[in-house]
C-alpha cells in the first residue's frame, strides 16, 4: 500500500508517523520542495517509477477528491472514491471513479470486482 499526495512527502511521513501508521505503508510519495514533483499526475508518475516492477493494470487509486480521480485517469489507473473525505462524491463520479465506498471495510469487495 502506498500513499500518493500532492502535499510535501516529508510532511506526509511526519503526519503518518504522528498517528503511528507510517509502517503500514510500503511507500509514501508526495510533492517535492524543489517543485520537481508538484501535481497529482507527477506524484502518481513517481509512484509508477518507484514501483516499476508492479504492472500498472494491477494498481488502483483510492481518493477523496476529484483531483485524485482526474490524476488517476491521466496515468491510466482505475480509481475508487471514498465518500468520507474532503471531496464531493458527485464530482468524483463525474470525473470517472469506478466505484464509491462509504466505509473502508467495503474496499476488498470493490477491489475484487474491479480486478476480476
Task: Say what each PLM segment does.
Residues 11, 43-44, 88, 96:
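Hydrophobic alpha-helical segments typical of transmembrane helices
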Residues 11-14, 71, 91, 109-110:
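Phosphate- and divalent-cation-binding pockets in alpha/beta enzyme and binding domains
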Residues 20-24, 52-54:
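Short helix-capping segments at alpha-helix termini
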Residues 22-37:
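A short, structured active-site edge motif that brings together acidic residues
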Residues 40-71:
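Conserved Lys-Pro-Asp/Glu-containing loop-to-beta segment of HAD-superfamily phosphomonoesterases
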Residues 61-101:
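Acidic, Mg2+-coordinating phosphoryl-transfer loop and its flanking beta/alpha structural elements
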Residues 110-116:
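Short amphipathic alpha-helix with an adjacent loop that forms part of the alpha/beta core around
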Amino acid at each position: 500500500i502506498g500513499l500518493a499526495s500532492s502535499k510535501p512527502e516529508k510532511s506526509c511521513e511526519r503526519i503518518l508517523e504522528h498517528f503511528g501508521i507510517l509502517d503500514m505503508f510500503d511507500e509514501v510519495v508526495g510533492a517535492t520542495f524543489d517543485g520537481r514533483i508538484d501535481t497529482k499526475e507527477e506524484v502518481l508518475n513517481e509512484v509508477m517509477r518507484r514501483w516499476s516492477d508492479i504492472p500498472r493494470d494491477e494498481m488502483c487509486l483510492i481518493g477523496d477528491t476529484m483531483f485524485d480521480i482526474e490524476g488517476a485517469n491521466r496515468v491510466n489507473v482505475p480509481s475508487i472514491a471514498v465518500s468520507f473525505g474532503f471531496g464531493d462524491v458527485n464530482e468524483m463520479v463525474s470525473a470517472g471513479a469506478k466505484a464509491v465506498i462509504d466505509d473502508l471495510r467495503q474496499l476488498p469487495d470493490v477491489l475484487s470486482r474491479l480486478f476480476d
